[in-house]
UniProtKB/Swiss-Prot annotation:
Species whose genome carries this gene: Homo sapiens (Human)
The entry's DNA-binding region: 13-90
UniProt-annotated stretches for the region Required for transcriptional repression: 341-385
Primary location class: nucleus
Positions of the NR LBD domain: 155-383
Highest taxon, organism lineage: Eukaryota
GO cellular component: chromatin; nucleoplasm
Biological process, per Gene Ontology: aggressive behavior; amygdala development; angiogenesis; anterior commissure morphogenesis; apoptotic process; astrocyte cell migration; astrocyte differentiation; behavioral fear response
Compartments it resides in: Nucleus
Tissue specificity annotation: Brain specific. Present in all brain sections tested, highest levels in the caudate nucleus and hippocampus, weakest levels in the thalamus.
UniProt keywords, alphabetically: Activator, Developmental protein, DNA-binding, Metal-binding, Nucleus, Receptor, Repressor, Transcription, Transcription regulation, Zinc, Zinc-finger
This protein's name: Nuclear receptor subfamily 2 group E member 1
Zinc fingers, NR C4-type class: 16-36, 52-78
Length: 385
């Protein structure tokens, strides 16, 4: 149930002392937005030292639009407005903390007023009833509730905080510069994973299957859903940035493993570029998600071959997804008779990057050695999602 405007936890009339955005209350002694308070906390806890991008320490603009461009000047501004470093150091994380509990807390957060928390663009989608819930889910933006984490190990949930949309350019300069992307990629990856789970739970046909079948489908399709999300929401996949995010380099990683990961990142770049060239709309993405999810093929769990309880129903749902996509393209893009075939031919390329590489690059720093499949199962079963 939504809260009345007067009882919202957002302090709508007091600006952030650092960037001027709307404050969400007092953080470390001053009124600040979630983005600046989170940045300050991470910087102090990790004892970060930043170098000004322009070489003019403190001279870069720190406002709502430019706050992510120079970390050095942003941190300097935080200190200038008297954010309290000691308050960060003395903050105590939960004594007992599980991913399940933190995921539950995450989904108790409320949507930010006026749609400010909707990080991804929405669209009105003329789609059959089978996909109505699927396409309507796409724009959902979820606000992080107050979840404390230990300084040693940020969780996936703690990274899924509201941040601005990725503007493709600001004053002609790409926003996904090295420092910006390094921090933002992990946050975006966390959101994509949450969105994939919430999306699956909201597909009416998906929920009619047994829980075992649902989990098997999700565990097998999460990689493709994740890559589709990267393509759909224009998340940067620059190789240097992704390697920086993962922390891997020639000094700390076996050369064979590093070369494999670099090769798969290049494959990811290629498949994402091919999707972006075709400029898919939200309905096409929704249909493709259903096609890659409803695969009635036995899967392996370790050495065990697992079969679906209702493979026939799953196969029928995939057929319906393909028919819906074909019909939609025929109506929406009548001058592109080959478009349907081109999209289907792209789907195998979604598996060109291995699940282990995605985990290593996008999630290792946030969830450690917790297997993504276990995390998916745990979150999917949560009633809070």
């Amino acid at each position: 149930m939504s809260k009345p405007a007067g009882s919202t936890s957002r302090i709508l009339d007091i600006p952030c002392k650092v960037c001027g955005d709307r404050s969400s209350g007092k953080h470390y002694g001053v009124y600040a937005c979630d983005g600046c308070s989170g940045f300050f906390k991470r910087s102090i806890r990790r004892n970060r030292t930043y170098v000004c991008k322009s070489g003019n320490q403190g001279g870069c603009p720190v406002d709502k639009t430019h706050r992510n461009q120079c970390r050095a000047c942003r941190l300097k501004k935080c200190l200038e407005v008297n954010m309290n470093k000691d308050a960060v150091q003395h903050e105590r994380g939960p004594r007992t903390s599980t991913i399940r509990k933190q995921v539950a807390l995450y989904f108790r957060g409320h949507k930010e007023e006026n749609g400010a928390a909707a990080h991804f663009p929405s669209a009105a989608l003329p789609a059959p009833a089978f996909f109505t819930a699927v396409t309507q889910l796409e724009p959902h933006g979820l606000e992080l509730a107050a979840v404390s984490t230990t300084p040693e190990r940020q969780t996936l949930v703690s990274l899924a905080q509201p941040t601005p949309k990725y503007p493709h350019e600001v004053n002609g300069t790409p926003m996904y510069l090295y420092e910006v992307a390094t921090e933002s990629v992990c946050e975006s990856a966390a959101r994509l994973l949450f969105m994939s789970i919430k999306w699956a739970k909201s597909v009416p046909a998906f929920s009619t299957l047994s829980l075992q079948d649902q989990l098997m489908l999700l565990e097998d399709a999460w990689r493709e859903l994740f890559v589709l999300g990267i393509a759909q929401w224009a998340i940067p996949v620059d190789a240097n940035t992704l390697l920086a995010v993962s922390g891997m380099n020639g000094d700390n990683t076996d050369s064979q493993k590093l070369n494999k990961i670099i090769s798969e990142i290049q494959a990811l770049q290629e498949v994402v570029a091919r999707f972006r060239q075709l400029r898919l709309d939200a309905t096409e993405f929704a249909c493709l998600k259903c096609i890659v999810t409803f695969k009635a093929v036995p899967t392996h769990s370790g050495s065990e071959l697992r079969s679906f309880r209702n493979a026939a129903a799953i196969a029928a749902l995939q057929d319906e997804a393909q028919l819906t996509l074909n019909s939609y393209i025929h109506t929406r893009y009548p001058t592109q008779p080959c478009r349907f075939g081109k999209l289907l031919l792209l789907l195998p390329a979604l598996r060109s990057i291995s699940p282990s590489t995605i985990e290593e690059v996008f999630f290792k720093k946030t969830i450690g050695n917790v297997p993504i499949t276990r995390l998916l199962s745990d979150m999917y079963k949560s009633s809070d999602i």
